Amino acid sequence: MPSAEGPAAHVARALEEPTARQVATAFLSGSVRVTTRPGCPAGCLGVQGSLAAGDFGQPAHDTLAAWRDEVCSRLRDRFRRAVDEGDLTSDADTGLLARYLMTVSNGIAVQAAGGAGRDELQQVADAAL
């Protein structure tokens, strides 16, 4: 699971936000920032590494997929809490919300690796919300 330090620290911080919308906003904005940091490789190891793994890279693929699944589970749990607190409606599909954010975040990482800029990707994140 992402720690409070390092490239994925935005995940832990996002989960602490007081509302579901603020969680989603912090998560996607953090994804944009971390995948477009000056002086660092663009994209995300968790996405790129698992896509490029062949047979010999299966253990790495599995580890990175488990990491992404853990993030998705933590988002889902946070959205369930938002339902319990009345921040989201009782019929909100918390699993779908979490998977949606992960999918957008992963897409942001792929686009960043392909050369998309921070401002452009922030517009995508904003539109997704």
Feature names for model-found ranges:
Residues 24, 38-62:
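Amphipathic alpha-helical segments used for helix-helix packing
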Residues 34-37, 81, 101-118:
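Amphipathic C-terminal alpha-helical segment
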Residues 1-7:
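Short, basic, alpha-helical segments at the C-terminal edge of helix-turn-helix-like DNA-binding modules
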